């Protein structure tokens, strides 16, 4: 990760040294990009979370976070989330989708995530680290009171043992009800 930020710093230095001597090779960063750069450089992730940049080092605004819970119903699963960050960040929350199809009360089958800090509770003082910890918390403490997947929420609320069985079955690549899930363990 440090290498990524050294590349960005070198590009900034080259841009400054070219000042007045031809076109700059680096575009000017928006306030959102600068804030995101700061947030990423200050990330303090648990060992069970990893960040990657599938579009390369020059696209910090789109990245993926992989969460591998080390406790709870989702123990040992691998869940990938895509983050799209607009230039309006931090005044606008990042767009987060779960790329891994998962049986979860707070994540629907299309990957939409129900996390209050990504909606009505977003504030500019929050950062990417806060969002990642929020996602991690969804796997250690799924919330049946604010669901996107109402069926999973009802099972969690009414029969936690059946919910645990369904989660394991889904994570092993099985079927829950009429829905098939890819293996994610």
Curated annotation (Swiss-Prot):
Pathway: Protein modification; protein neddylation
Active site: 114
Family matches, as InterPro entries: UBQ-conjugat_E2_core, UBQ-conjugating_AS, UBQ-conjugating_enzyme/RWD
Region called Disordered, residue ranges: 8-29
Cross-referenced CDD domains: UBCc_UBE2F_UBE2M
Entry superkingdom: Eukaryota
One Pfam entry name: UQ_con
Polar residues: bias regions: 16-28
Major enzyme class: transferase
Record-annotated UBC core domain positions: 31-176
GO terms, molecular function: ATP binding; transferase activity
Keyword check for Glycoprotein: no
Single Gene Ontology BP annotation: protein neddylation
Listed SMART domains: UBCc
Family classification: Belongs to the ubiquitin-conjugating enzyme family. UBC12 subfamily.
Function: Accepts the ubiquitin-like protein NEDD8/RUB1 from the ECR1-AXR1 E1 complex and catalyzes its covalent attachment to other proteins.
The protein's name: Probable NEDD8-conjugating enzyme Ubc12-like
Gene this chain is encoded by: RCE2
